Amino acid sequence: MAKKKNKAGDNTIALNKRARHDYFIEEEIEAGLSLQGWEVKSMRAGKANISDSYVIFNNGEAFLFGATIQPLSVASTHVVCDPTRTRKLLLNERELASLFGKANRDGYTLVALSLYWKNAWAKLKIGLAKGKKQHDKREDIKDREWKVQKDRIMKNAHRG
């Protein structure tokens, strides 16, 4: 039997929807993750959460902090599973230097946007982010509501 190809939407493991609400995303970067076996199994089962995760730098390396990958109940018992451990990001030297310089500017941080599969590899989309003020969030909500209202008006106008 032929193997089915994954559709474009099937490869997403976890999304950080709050990131686009709380931050202006200026740049997006794709990074690999250094994972343990039980983490890959749990991610295949969809037990990952990156809602409050961000990137920290330590000794010239980048790490994902705050991501939670819940272990499966059928996972091996001889391995100690820490769901909230910091995971190393796999970036080349040039990408690390660029991100480190950009993230050290005032008001900027690196947040996790999405976790997904690319072929057989788990990838993390990182966003260079600047925090939004409350009035910026209100403007986004107004724009979104106006777009919905405009679409509704156009739909009714076409029915005519």
From Swiss-Prot:
The gene is smpB. One of its GO terms (molecular function) is RNA binding. Belongs to the SmpB family. It comes from Actinobacillus succinogenes (strain ATCC 55618 / DSM 22257 / CCUG 43843 / 130Z). One of its GO terms (biological process) is trans-translation. InterPro entries: SmpB, SsrA-bd_prot, SsrA-bd_prot_CS. The lineage of its organism: Bacteria, Pseudomonadati, Pseudomonadota, Gammaproteobacteria, Pasteurellales. Keywords: Cytoplasm, RNA-binding. This is SsrA-binding protein. Its main location: cytoplasm.
